[in-house]
From Swiss-Prot:
It comes from the Eukaryota. Homodimer. This is D-amino-acid transaminase, chloroplastic. Pathway: Cofactor biosynthesis; tetrahydrofolate biosynthesis; 4-aminobenzoate from chorismate: step 2/2. Its cofactor is pyridoxal 5'-phosphate. The active site is at K222. One of its GO terms (cellular component) is chloroplast. The keyword rRNA-binding does not apply. It is found in: Plastid, Chloroplast. GO terms for biological process: 4-aminobenzoate biosynthetic process; tetrahydrofolate biosynthetic process. PANTHER family: AMINO-ACID AMINOTRANSFERASE (PTHR42743), D-AMINO-ACID TRANSAMINASE, CHLOROPLASTIC (PTHR42743:SF22). InterPro entries: Aminotrans_IV (IPR001544), Aminotransferase-like (IPR036038), BCAT-like_C (IPR043132), BCAT-like_N (IPR043131), Class-IV_PLP-Dep_Aminotrnsfr (IPR050571). Amino acid aminotransferase showing activity for D-Asp and D-Ala as amino donors with 2-oxoglutarate as an amino acceptor. Can also use D-Met, D-Tyr, D-Phe, D-Gln, D-Trp and D-Asn as substrates, but no activity with L-Asp, L-Ala, L-Leu, L-Ile or L-Val. Also catalyzes the reverse reaction where an amino group is transferred from D-Glu to pyruvate or oxaloacetate to produce D-Ala or D-Asp, respectively. Also involved in folate biosynthesis, acting as an aminodeoxychorismate lyase converting 4-amino-4-deoxychorismate (ADC) to p-aminobenzoate (PABA).
Length: 373
């Protein structure tokens, strides 16, 4: 390049004489198998004679720096099929950079709450990640029961009784190309995070998201490609709102960035939720629909429906709520510039939240898996 001269010197050690030997610039660097501690200096000179001093670290030094960087994190245990084991050292909770989930987004994930020593809706979330993996054409590294056993054991090793279990299925490490054909094998990762499951029943404001919604083929897969979701959330926060609401091209309400939505209409007697055809099928949302039948039995609600909901109808609803495993139900009192109902938290959202919390604490074995600590 005209006007720019490069002078790279990498000081390595000769194994016999321990004298420094210059290594010319190539496409990569070849290091001796045994090295003493050293500092590599990469000199890049141009008209301004700039230089940088970048240390080359031993594996021990890398580990020590990672421990400092991870200080205070509540990461209690991680499983990686790459090493086929569980670690409780946060500094060791790393992924290969050549994993296609990292550099190509070819991976899917899911989560399950840990509540009082039980995994809530583990089977439902596990079924969903397996569907997502199939749609993303990611082969399974293990069968379903083995994956479930690994997830439960990871929580058991962590000792966490209240927190979150997150897990991923990836095309796996192999190279930095687009196709996964050279990936060694698909991978499973899982991590246990200690969190405070705080319930906030205070109503929030939402806004209509201007970020393009994912097409159904991708919206129905819980993949790691969350850039639209992140941008939607950032847009909402910049407008002083809790979340953004996506609307499909036909004008029907879709979902939030990581939650479903529901409405109470017809004088507070009907619970309606947008169809799941073009959005991610929410496990907590589906469980809420099941629990809502108890309100029908008590005469509090007349019907529970899954149907198309227009923005106009949604904004005219008596109540609106967001539903997701981390919330789990949050009332919405304002959408854009319009108040929902009376502009305050409604009774149905509270009743559904109470039912869901009771289900999390003492629900049937179909939704609660005991962790053997």
């Amino acid at each position: 390049m005209a006007g720019l001269s490069l002078e790279f010197t990498v000081n390595t050690w000769n194994l016999r004489s321990l004298s420094q030997v210059p290594c010319p610039l190539r496409h990569g660097f070849r290091f001796p198998r045994r090295l003493t501690r050293r500092r590599t200096i990469l000199m890049c000179s141009d008209s301004s004679s700039q230089s940088w001093n970048v240390p080359v670290l031993s594996s021990y030094e890398v580990g020590e720096r990672l421990k400092l960087a991870r200080g205070g994190q509540q990461f209690l245990a991680m499983y990686s099929s790459v090493v086929d084991g569980i670690t409780t050292d946060p500094a060791a909770m790393v992924l290969p950079l050549d994993d296609h989930m990292v550099h190509r987004g070819h991976g899917v994930f899911d989560t399950a709450l840990i509540i009082n020593g039980y995994l809530y809706e583990l089977d439902q979330h596990l079924d969903r990640i397996l569907r997502s993996a199939s749609m993303a054409k990611i082969p399974l590294p293990f069968d379903r029961e083995t994956i479930k056993r690994i997830l439960i054991q990871t929580v058991s090793v962590s000792g966490c009784r209240d927190g979150s279990l997150r897990y991923w299925l990836s095309a796996g490490p192999g190279d930095f190309l687009l196709s996964p054909s050279q990936c060694l094998k698909p991978t499973l990762y899982a991590i246990v995070i200690k969190t405070n499951f705080a319930i906030n029943p205070i109503g929030v404001k939402v806004v209509t998201s201007s970020i393009p919604i994912k097409p159904p083929e991708f919206a129905t897969v819980k993949s790691v490609n969350y850039l639209p979701n992140v941008l939607s959330q950032m847009e909402a926060e910049a407008k002083g709102a809790y979340a953004g609401i996506w609307v499909c091209k036909d004008g029907f309400i879709a979902e939030g960035p990581n939650m479903n939505v529901a409405f109470v209409v017809n004088g507070g007697k009907e619970l309606v939720m947008p169809r799941f055809d073009n959005v991610l099928s929410g496990c907590t949302a589906k469980r809420t629909l099941t629990l809502a039948e108890q309100l029908v039995s008590k005469g509090i609600l007349k019907t529970v429906k899954v149907m198309d909901v227009t923005v106009e109808d949604g904004k005219k609803a008596d109540e609106m709520m967001l539903i997701g495993s981390g919330i789990p139900i949050r009332p919405v009192i304002q959408w854009d510039e319009e108040f929902i109902g009376e502009g305050k938290e409604g009774p149905i959202a509270k009743a559904l939240l109470d039912l869901l919390l009771e289900d999390m604490r003492s629900g049937p074995p179909s939704v609660r898996v005991l962790v053997p600590y």
